[in-house]
Amino acid sequence: MRKNKLFVFLLALILSISSLSTIAFGYSITSASEDSELNWYFVNRGKDTLPECPKEATGLLSKYDAYYLGDTNEKVIYLTFDEGYENGYTPKILDVLRDEKVPAAFFVVKPYIVDNPEIIKRMADEGHLVCNHSNHHPSMASITDPEKFKAEFTDVEEVYKEIVGSDMPKFFRPPM
């Protein structure tokens, strides 16, 4: 069973990496103003060394009662996927997740939902979280019109509800 879970994780990791054009690690903040765009990444500090929360982020985390690291004694992996387009891998990934009883979270954009309603239904039916990744995948900090900003969330939620018949889970992964 352990080897199977490792296989699922490695398969997902390989598929995720193969679909990325660049991978960046680090954290940056341009300024402390309210309209600054924050970039949030992982900084690898070496083997057996926990990542450190960037000093610039500690106030933000405290303000929203959020955390950077969970219980480090607990061995938990959160498996997440960004679904912006479909290359035929998702049904295969869902098969493995189902067979191994591994839950995952899929962050989807509106066009993905519209183009793949059966896959979306299957994700939800099999107990996975299907979460919001925006309508058009913009840099959210660049949207100055409040209605356009709101629509990036609500347009996705509405089409999800039409297809699945229930509200979309309230998790959002901002596009970078």
Stretches with model-predicted labels:
Residues A12-L13, A24:
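Cleavable N-terminal signal peptides
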Residues L15-S19:
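Hydrophobic core
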Residues L20-S33:
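Sec-dependent signal peptide cleavage junction
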Residues N44-T144, K148, D155-K161, G165-K170:
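Active-site beta->alpha N-cap acidic-glycine motif
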Residues M1-A12:
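N-terminal Sec-pathway targeting helices
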Residues S31-L50:
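Helix-enriched interaction subdomains in cytosolic or periplasmic regions
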Residues M176:
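Active-site microenvironments of hydrolase-like enzyme catalytic domains
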